[in-house]
Amino acid sequence: MAEKVQYYMEQSVPELEDLLEKNIFNRDEINNIIKTRRVFEEKLARRQVKLNDFLSYIQYEINLETLRAKRHKRLNITGKITISDYAGPRKVLFLFLRATNKFFGDVTLWLDYIHYAQKIKAVNIVGKICVAALQKHPNNAELWVVACDHEFSINANVSAARALMNRALRLNQENPVIWAAYFRLELSYMTKLFARSQILTGNISSKTENITNGVSEDTIGSLSSDTIQLPMVSMEEFLGSSSSEVRKNDSDLNISDDIGNISSKEQQTQKFANVLLQIILNSRKNLSLQNYVGFFVSVLDALFECFDVPVVQYMYQENIIGICNEHFEHFKNESGEIYGVLLHRWCFLEIFIKLRGAYPSNDSGISGKGIFGLKKNDPRITSMVLTDPGFVDDLQAIVEKYQSISSDFQIPFKTKKIFYSFFVKTLHAISSSSAAESSIALALHMLVINAFQSMEKLKILTFDDSLQEIYKEAQIQSGTFMSNATLS
């Protein structure tokens, strides 16, 4: 044990000498670092080592590196990079490696390892860590999503990201999180291609070019026999023209060419929509009913966010409205939290499309990270929607759907309970916006009160403090508040 401790201590000698030479730490501080590291190394050398020993050591080294970086900046040290400039992060990574070798069953440890490597921009190491983690935990959806997000967002390699998702689905066909991540991956790729095509055709300014920086132009090639078969769509097909045609001026195009291009673009839009539709159909074959509904809620949230893309607009009109109505009739008899969330999305479908997201944004069926996570609601878009004269018609559609749900006795109480909870929170969030006109806000508050009265009548909900506050505020705003009015 002593030899092992001494070996690791000797590895840090060049680093400590460099720190002393640069006057970042004085002699006493160096001695203190040596003593602290020796204590940690002795703990790690024991036969019964604990995970907390590794975590404490890692946190100490991270704090030490943070202090070193601050002093380095304050002293304004210039010159070439020396060993002390990179020894800190390297030591932390090595400690994570030792920890994962010992406690390879801890998924949180692997995720912390990946996140630290991403934080210090060790791109090549992140990929290796993901591979090692997935070898130990092939059935963990979060690790697959993190690995895919790294390939797509950081490495700009959509082919590798797609290969990871297909491999994940082969091993976890019944996991809705991976299906939702796969859908968002394809949708994100299409969104990037759309933004890039807008730049190439001159329809938007170059300010949006950062959206597509580093995006690979690899085509969606044919997949192996054991992967999900999807239609092939390339960048050239998406643009609907060759690169030479893109560079032509508008004056060079005649009317017949324009008509041909429009037809071609419509065909490409249908191809892209078919890719997304196939994912939905395949997921329904592989997932249980409850898992599929959770997946579909996540699909709706993703489509809400990307409604500016023509593919999503086409898919919404041709497929999603019909699927949502069919799901409402087919699943309304099911009891469970996720079915109440689905009713909530169906009820607010028209408004969420315009708001570019479910409202509030934290009300999601399936959570995710990176490109797979939900975006926050944009106050500017909310303001535009609430001041639009058409919002009154959308509100009327919500009222009609709400009434159909309230009066439908086939919907189980448990499902209605979740729906009402989400319903009042959404109305409260929208009515609380500064852009909401007084008449609109009043109508929303009255609708909230009606929902609370329905819940009280059915006795299906025990109100928490947040719902109590919403009910009280709605009564005050509508002029019906009584000081002794409380909810059971």
UniProtKB/Swiss-Prot annotation:
The subcellular localization recorded is: Nucleus, Nucleolus
GO cellular component annotations, sorted alphabetically?
cell division site; cytosol; nucleus; Pwp2p-containing subcomplex of 90S preribosome; small-subunit processome; sno(s)RNA-containing ribonucleoprotein complex
Keyword set includes NAD: no
Q: What biological-process GO terms show up in the record?
A: maturation of SSU-rRNA from tricistronic rRNA transcript (SSU-rRNA, 5.8S rRNA, LSU-rRNA)
- Tell me, in one coarse class, where this protein mainly resides: nucleus
Q: Keywords, A to Z?
A: Nucleus, Repeat, Ribonucleoprotein, Ribosome biogenesis, rRNA processing
- One MF term in the entry's GO annotations: snoRNA binding
Q: What do we know about how this protein assembles, alone or with others? A: Component of the ribosomal small subunit (SSU) processome, composed of the 35S pre-rRNA precursor, the U3 snoRNA, and at least 40 protein subunits. Interacts with U3 snoRNA.
Q: What is this protein called?
A: U3 small nucleolar RNA-associated protein 6
Give the source species.
Schizosaccharomyces pombe (strain 972 / ATCC 24843) (Fission yeast)
